[in-house]
Amino acid sequence: TGADVSFSRVPKKWFIKGDKDKNYYLCANAVQNVSSETADNALKAMKNWSGIDNLKNIKNETLIVWGDKDTSYNFEQVDTLNKNIKNSRLEIFENCSHNVHLEKPNEFNILVEKFINQ
């Protein structure tokens, strides 16, 4: 199905190096276990859902991490989170795609540790 094709392509876009990234297999394996029906339902839900009105209800300090090469979420979407979550902070990682935590794990872990301990 179209969902199968889409889901098989998605993990490549989550890494700057695509399927050549050392951690690509983690995401590729994860989507292999998704049924066609589940994949199709997920795509429909993502297309038709918006949680923007609910963002104002988030009161906790929130760290938003985004890779500047992410093709899953564009900057406008991430900026919407940052502008609508009162206590949020946006950190942008250069030369990273969707999986910042896998592409730059040391820098990501340092950032999260500092955020938690602030």
Residue ranges: model-predicted function:
Residues 10, 43, 81, 108-112, ...:
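Hydrophobic "lid"/C-terminal helical patch
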Residues 44, 63, 89-91:
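Structural signal for short hydrophobic segments within the conserved structured cores
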Residues 88-118:
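Catalytic active-site module of serine/aspartate enzymes centered on a nucleophile-bearing elbow/loop
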Residues 59-60, 87:
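Active-site acidic short loop of glycosyltransferases
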Residues 58, 64-66, 70:
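Short beta-strand/loop motif that positions the catalytic acidic residue
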Residues 31, 47, 70, 97-100:
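Glycosyltransferase donor-binding loop in the core domain
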Residues 2-56:
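Conserved alpha/beta-hydrolase catalytic His-Asp/Glu region
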Residues 71-77:
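Conserved alpha/beta-hydrolase "acid-adjacent" motif
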